[in-house]
């Protein structure tokens, strides 16, 4: 009997089972212990293969692929700390709803806790973060193939969001020629190999339930808060709120067109919050709200009812309102709860939103990151998409810009870390094939710098804007101790990215004014390559501009 041959047959069943659940993209890191999985994936023509040498980046690449494809994405890594590097992407997927399937190769049980090389305790290492965890046994013909395939099917068939961890121990030898070992074991699955359906079919129910008193609440004074959702959902939510005559407070990830722009400015005005106090119901569609003042208002508002609609399970209200947590697809829920045409009940807020936008426009000429955030909609590629980083950049865009309704926007706003942002953007571009504008800060770019390797091969133009304000200037907005701020919070690195771009043979521009930036964009959108645009700005100007605008609008 050939151990290596049976390892591969065992792995082939696992990989084939994944295809029955919509897995098309598979991300593979180099490793020896994962050889059976890697070779099985390579031999399966149903997969689109992606490779990367950094497992942390690989996990985020898979995350980006899953964001756009809306399908589960598989990841293969070897044993040891390679597995631990998948933790950040798994955590993010659990919070934002992407489906990841982590296939982690492992040493067999007799090599654990005995000093064997690259052997750690992998079963259960992700604690409660996976939706489902499977610790497979060492491959053996004593276990029928139908057990293996039905075990995989059960985990994936009930997967609605988040990650599945499948730990796969393999004994040596890992290499060798294929023979007939295990062929009859495989063939006991019969015509399943020619079919395209799971062996065990389980359909998770996510049917929207109609709220029978909706006809009553839709006649009241309401507010719509729009969080993260798809582009199509964003357009539907905007129309729904407009028909109801309810003010819509749209997050940067809502893709609603933000009909009341600059919410994080005007929510600091007492006239706005006073008017919002008249709301009898708040309906929040989508989660992951960005703006600080929106979150402050959301925490303090006390309507008669607060409804949260999202297809992600679990609690999504840190303010613990009295109301309803409705687990449903947003578009389906809107269809079950049609709007009734009514006149807008808010008078002050539309006026304040317009005045706030005019205040932002009055400052748009200076060459800075706040102004870039405001202008970002001018630079979006046609039929393209936007990927927004975390920290200061997403807050500036949320507060100062007005993105087009239905324009795809992606970000990692679950745990809101700055790790893996470039890798995630690479996955977003690969899955869609669309022109992509990605914008991150300098520390975020440094954190995931080796992901520039993933940007060498793109199917459409990709522009990566690195806003270099020399450190984590988000901390300039926080009451961090002045004497310790630079050393322990901002951590300026005094670097530029020209040589990083050159290392990976990417085009690079460092514009000094708006005209040079626009010229760089015009050049970048012409060819299906990656262009790095480094925008060097004064360290604290962006944070200061935001603070000044917030103060100005609060006194309108």
Swiss-Prot record:
Keyword NAD: no
CDD domains: TPP_PYR_MenD, TPP_SHCHC_synthase
UniProt entry keywords in alphabetical sequence: Magnesium, Manganese, Menaquinone biosynthesis, Metal-binding, Thiamine pyrophosphate, Transferase
InterPro entries with a match to the protein in the record: MenaQ_synth_MenD (IPR004433), MenD_middle (IPR032264), THDP-binding (IPR029061), Thiamin_PyroP_enz_TPP-bd_dom (IPR012001), TPP_enzyme_TPP-bd (IPR011766)
Reaction(s) catalysed by this chain's protein: isochorismate + 2-oxoglutarate + H(+) = 5-enolpyruvoyl-6-hydroxy-2-succinyl-cyclohex-3-ene-1-carboxylate + CO2
UniProt cofactor note: Binds 1 thiamine pyrophosphate per subunit.
GO MF, any single term: 2-succinyl-5-enolpyruvyl-6-hydroxy-3-cyclohexene-1-carboxylic-acid synthase activity
GO BP terms, alphabetized: menaquinone biosynthetic process
EC number: 2.2.1.9
Keyword Manganese: yes
Source superkingdom: Bacteria
Cofactor: Mg(2+); Mn(2+); thiamine diphosphate
Quaternary structure and partners: Homodimer.
Family: Belongs to the TPP enzyme family. MenD subfamily.
Stated name of the protein: 2-succinyl-5-enolpyruvyl-6-hydroxy-3-cyclohexene-1-carboxylate synthase
Species in which this protein is naturally found: Shigella boydii serotype 18 (strain CDC 3083-94 / BS512)
